[in-house]
Design a protein with these regions (language model features):
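Alpha-helical transmembrane segments of multi-pass membrane transport proteins
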Residues: 1-403
C-alpha cells in the first residue's frame, strides 16, 4: 500500500462518500446554474447602463454603478471570475471614454467582483457550513452586513478620492447621457426588479426558515431559467453551454472538496489539530494575538491557494484551537471569508487581476495591481472592524434566530 495502511484507503472512500452525499452541498450546482443563467439573461448590462445614465452628472458615477451592480449580482452569481470579467467588459470601455483613472477603475471593478465570495448565497459559505458544523442559514445571515460594510467602504473611498481630485472620475460626456429619463427608469426597473426579486426570494426563504439552502437553490435555478426565457435570451445552445459550465465548475469544486476533506481527515487522525491546540494554548498568549496569527496565516495561504483547500484542510486543523479559545464560530467563519476575499486582491497571485487583464488588455497589469492594493487596504480595515465589533457579523443571526 505504498507505505499506507489499508485503513487509509477505507478512510478515503468514506470521506469521498460523505462529501458526495452531503445534502447541503447539493445547493452548489444549483446556485452555480442560477448565476450562469442570470448572467446570460443580460440583466447585468441593462442595470449598469441604466444606473450610469441616472448618475451621468455625478462625479465618479461609473464607480458607483460598478459597485451597485456588483452587490446585486454578487448575490446572484457568487462566482468571482465571472463577476470581474463581466464588470470589466461592461465598465472599462465607458471608463476609458470618460477619462477615468485606470488604477482606481481597476481597483473598483476587481474589488466589486470579489464580493461574490462573501455576499449570500456564497458557494464558499455553503461549503464552509458543514465543515465547521454551522447551519448555512447562520452564515448567510452573518455575511450580509459585512458585505454591505465592505461595499460602503469602497464607495466612501471612491467618493473621497473624486472629491480631492475630480479628474479621477469626471462627469459623463453628453453623448453618454440619456435623451429621456423615462427610458432610463424603465431600463433600471427591468434590470433591477426581476433579478433582485429572485435573489431576495431565494435568500429570504433561507433566512426566514421557509426552505433549506438546497430547496431555495433549486427554486432560484428554476426562476433564473424562467427569467432568461422571459427576456428572450434562452436558446438551446445557451442552455447547453450553461449546463456544461455548471458541470465543469461543480465537478471541480466537489472533487477539490472531497480530496481536501480526505487530506484533512488524515491530518486529524495523526493528531495534528490536538498538537497544535495544546502547543499554542501552552504558550499562554493573548487569544486575540493567536487570532491575529491565524488571520495572517490564512491571508498568506490565500496568495498561492484557492479557497477550497484552505477551507477544507486548514480550517479543520485550527478549528479545535478556535473553539478552545472561546471564539464564536459563526463570527470566525465570516472573518475567514473576508480574509479569503482579501487574498483575491493581493498581488502577486491575485487572480482578479488576470481576469480583468484578459478582457481589458489595454490596461497595464502594473496599474491593475496598484488599484487592487488600494482596495486590499480597505479590506483589511473592514476585517479589523469586524474583529473589534463582532456584532457586525452576529447582530442579524442573533436577531433572526436568537443565538
Amino acid at each position: 500500500y505504498l507505505g499506507f495502511g489499508k485503513l487509509v484507503f477505507y478512510l478515503m472512500t468514506l470521506q469521498f462518500s460523505m462529501v458526495m452525499t452531503e445534502q447541503t452541498l447539493a445547493a452548489v450546482p444549483l446556485f452555480v446554474f442560477m448565476g450562469i443563467m442570470m448572467e446570460q439573461a443580460g440583466l447585468m448590462e441593462r442595470l449598469f447602463s441604466a444606473f450610469q445614465m441616472m448618475l451621468a452628472k455625478v462625479k465618479g458615477s461609473l464607480y458607483y454603478a460598478v459597485l451597485f451592480v456588483s452587490v446585486i449580482f454578487a448575490a446572484a452569481t457568487g462566482i468571482v471570475g465571472a463577476s470581474v470579467t463581466i464588470l470589466g467588459i461592461m465598465a472599462a470601455k465607458s471608463m476609458n471614454r470618460s477619462g477615468y483613472d485606470v488604477k482606481l477603475a481597476a481597483g473598483t471593478i476587481t474589488a466589486g467582483g470579489t464580493l461574490g465570495i462573501l455576499i449570500p448565497p456564497s458557494i464558499m459559505l455553503v461549503v464552509m457550513g458543514p465543515i465547521m458544523e454551522i447551519p448555512v442559514i447562520d452564515l448567510f445571515a452573518a455575511a450580509i452586513l459585512p458585505g454591505i460594510l465592505l461595499a460602503s467602504l469602497y464607495a466612501a473611498y471612491t467618493t473621497i478620492r473624486c472629491m480631492i481630485n475630480p479628474k479621477l472620475g469626471p462627469v459623463l460626456p453628453d453623448d453618454m447621457r440619456a435623451a429621456s429619463m423615462k427610458e432610463v427608469w424603465i431600463e433600471f426597473f427591468l434590470g433591477l426588479v426581476p433579478p433582485a426579486a429572485l435573489v431576495f426570494a431565494a435568500l429570504g426563504s433561507i433566512l426566514f426558515g421557509f426552505a433549506t439552502p438546497t430547496e431555495a437553490a433549486g427554486c432560484g435555478a428554476m426562476g433564473a431559467l424562467l427569467l432568461s426565457l422571459a427576456y428572450k435570451k434562452l436558446t438551446l445552445s445557451k442552455l447547453q453551454e450553461a449546463l456544461v459550465k455548471t458541470l465543469e465548475i461543480t465537478a471541480l469544486i466537489m472533487v477539490l472538496v472531497a480530496a481536501s476533506n480526505f487530506f484533512g481527515a488524515v491530518f486529524a487522525r495523526l493528531g495534528t489539530p490536538t498538537l497544535l491546540t495544546e502547543f499554542l494554548l501552552g504558550l499562554e498568549m493573548n487569544k486575540y494575538l493567536i487570532l491575529a496569527m491565524i488571520m495572517v496565516m490564512i491571508f498568506l495561504l490565500g496568495w498561492p491557494l484557492e479557497w477550497v483547500p484552505i477551507v477544507m484542510i486548514i480550517i479543520p486543523i485550527i478549528l479545535p484551537l478556535v473553539e478552545a479559545l472561546g471564539f464564536n464560530l459563526t463570527w470566525f467563519a465570516i472573518l475567514v471569508a473576508v480574509n479569503l476575499q482579501t487574498a483575491w486582491l493581493s498581488p502577486p497571485v491575485a487572480l482578479s487581476a488576470y481576469f480583468l487583464k484578459g478582457v481589458v488588455p489595454e490596461w497595464d497589469l502594473k496599474d491593475i495591481y496598484y488599484g487592487m492594493m488600494q482596495f486590499m487596504v480597505l479590506q483589511v480595515i473592514g476585517l479589523v472592524l469586524i474583529i473589534i465589533f463582532p456584532k457586525i457579523a452576529l447582530w442579524l443571526p442573533t436577531l433572526l434566530y436568537g443565538q
